[in-house]
Amino acid sequence: MNVGIIGFQGDVEEHIAIVKKISRRRKGINVLRIRRKEDLDRSDSLIIPGGESTTIYKLISEYGIYDEIIRRAKEGMPVMATCAGLILISKDTNDDRVPGMNLLDVTIMRNAYGRQVNSFETDIDIKGIGTFHAVFIRAPRIKEYGNVDVMASLDGYPVMVRSGNILGMTFHPELTGDVSIHEYFLSMGGGGYISTATG
């Protein structure tokens, strides 16, 4: 199973480290840093990391990856998007500089929790996973949502949602060392991986 991670900007190394941590226990998992369309072609599933959404959008568009992500996702490739990644895959980004891929029926408000100094950590309860210590850094907020499964909420707003093969969250699961969300994502398909996560 080849797990692709968009590798231009943001928490790329942190996601790579988490997937490699899982691969040490479960054979057959490889990590690919996606910088070209050809890299995406070799991927069974995809992680779009947090970072700066306008920068990531510009680069994946320039390298022909943006439209390819949409095509592969609509064909069923599992996609996990965190923070800025969630902005990119949303239906409405509320930012003309970053057109959403419309892979998740959510409307986003960027940097809703404030600036870097307003970042915070808190425990959340995730359906099917359990308690998770979530790190929110200049996090977006899901203002509105349609046909998605809300897996976790905070202060009345969804912070993790799923629709079929698409998983999105406003926080950074790669910054905690806890592999449970990545385990859950890998169990969604794309290469026959079976999760051993217990929550």
From Swiss-Prot:
Matching Gene3D superfamilies: 3.40.50.880
InterPro entries: Class_I_gatase-like (IPR029062), PdxT/SNO (IPR002161), PdxT/SNO_CS (IPR021196)
MF-aspect GO terms: glutaminase activity; pyridoxal 5'-phosphate synthase (glutamine hydrolysing) activity
Active site residues according to the UniProt entry: C83 (nucleophile), H172 (charge relay system), E174 (charge relay system)
EC number: 4.3.3.6, 3.5.1.2
Pathway: Cofactor biosynthesis; pyridoxal 5'-phosphate biosynthesis
Function of the molecule: Catalyzes the hydrolysis of glutamine to glutamate and ammonia as part of the biosynthesis of pyridoxal 5'-phosphate. The resulting ammonia molecule is channeled to the active site of PdxS.
Family of this protein: Belongs to the glutaminase PdxT/SNO family.
Protein name listed in UniProt: Pyridoxal 5'-phosphate synthase subunit PdxT
Designated gene of the protein: pdxT
